[in-house]
């Protein structure tokens, strides 16, 4: 009986030893990780205000995951068709609040760098001056305005307002066009919340000194989903017309007017990525 008891103890000891060794052999998680993202560069000549053609490039950024900080940034930008300039900044000062890391830096021809990284969404954006000559705002192709104040006017003259609607624009710098998605919009006339309204063709994009104006003179067909009896339903009854959306990257402002089916929509908010 005693031999059996000690045999059982030996088995438990062996299991404990193996488990302990497994814990000791675990490689520690790296404190930093470097990521890359494709960016659209909005470029303006500082002195004259001349708007230059958009360019695309990658940004590299290093994150200290333990302290939730951006510690290094490598910028790339091509000015008006010239060769791409690469600048690495290591003297970065950053702080994080509510999942958003804001960071600043300068050096190697870059002045007044201000950026933000969203730990939840994985989005990054930077504004900076280059060589004292150019103002550059680099964003990812998808530009968001979340929790936007939205007013709707219906055909019978009634109105509704909401603060939780989100607008997304996907900018194509080559064709200067953009798709649009509207999310969480209340249609009070039909007592339904539109989960998403996605345009099926692109609107035109004009590049301004501050950012972009997205507009369309023609009606854009959409695919719209909404919940009905607990299930998602799809409809085409919310085409977009009379669209004019102003995206002010310099001041982080968003304004838009459009006709969404029979609903006249006005939106005001912030650029949030």
Feature locations, PLM:
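Short, hydrophobic/aromatic-rich segments at coil-to-beta transitions
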Residues: 30-38, 68-73, 95-104, 142-149, ...
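Polar/charged low-complexity regions in secreted precursors and cytosolic/nuclear IDRs
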Residues: 48-49, 56, 64, 80, ...
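Extended lipid/amphipathic-ligand handling interfaces
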Residues: 58-65, 88-94, 114-119, 166-172, ...
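Contiguous, well-ordered beta-strand patches that form the walls/edges
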Residues: 76-114, 188-241
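Bacterial Sec-dependent N-terminal signal peptides
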Residues: 2-10, 14-40, 129-148, 258-273
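Repeat-associated, polar segments at repeat-unit boundaries in modular proteins
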Residues: 90-94, 114-142, 201-203, 210-212, ...
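N-terminal glycine/threonine-rich, aromatic-flanked beta-hairpin/loop signature
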Residues: 54-88, 160-198
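Flexible, membrane-facing loop/turn or short amphipathic-helix motifs
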Residues: 41-52, 82, 132, 137-141, ...
